[in-house]
Amino acid sequence: MPDSSTALRILVYSDNVQTRERVMRALGKRLHPDLPDLTYVEVATGPMVIRQMDRGGIDLAILDGEATPTGGMGIAKQLKDELASCPPILVLTGRPDDTWLASWSRAEAAVPHPVDPIVLGRTVLSLLRAPAH
């Protein structure tokens, strides 16, 4: 479990500002009393996701699988293939049946659109509590 004094940095990628806002609003600033505050790095393009992840310091990446022109599943696969120490990735899928695509991308979790705050919160909590690989 992360150090409770250092804020957790969550990268949120979508080309749609409303999707990014829904994700951040669903998670809030404090997901659970046992975890530190959450801070967000909003990203609207695929190249910026890669740049931010290369810089490091991200505790979790939430990638929109429906983003265009670069979808979050392809980015997730690229990050898992290229980063020696990649943080957990959650992919937002277009529908529940797309979970298999998220598995292909090597993302640790998938949550379907539209974002359900309870499902997203539980999923993110489990990823942030999981031991680092």
Curated annotation (Swiss-Prot):
Q: Kindly give the PROSITE patterns that the UniProt entry links to this protein.
A: RESPONSE_REGULATORY
What InterPro entries would the database entry show? CheY-like_superfamily, Sig_transdc_resp-reg_receiver
One GO cellular-component annotation of the UniProt record comes to: peptidoglycan-based cell wall
Q: Could you confirm whether the keyword Phosphoprotein appears in this record?
A: yes
Q: Does the keyword Chaperone apply?
A: no
Where does the Response regulatory domain lie? 9-128
Question: What does the record list as coiled-coil region(s)?
Answer: none
Q: Which GO terms describe its biological process?
A: phosphorelay signal transduction system
Which sequence positions carry the modification called 4-aspartylphosphate? D64
Q: Which SMART domains match?
A: REC (SM00448)
Q: Which UniProt key words apply to this protein? A: Phosphoprotein, Two-component regulatory system
- Would you tell me the protein name for this molecule? Uncharacterized response regulatory protein Rv3143
Q: Which organism is it from?
A: Mycobacterium tuberculosis (strain ATCC 25618 / H37Rv)
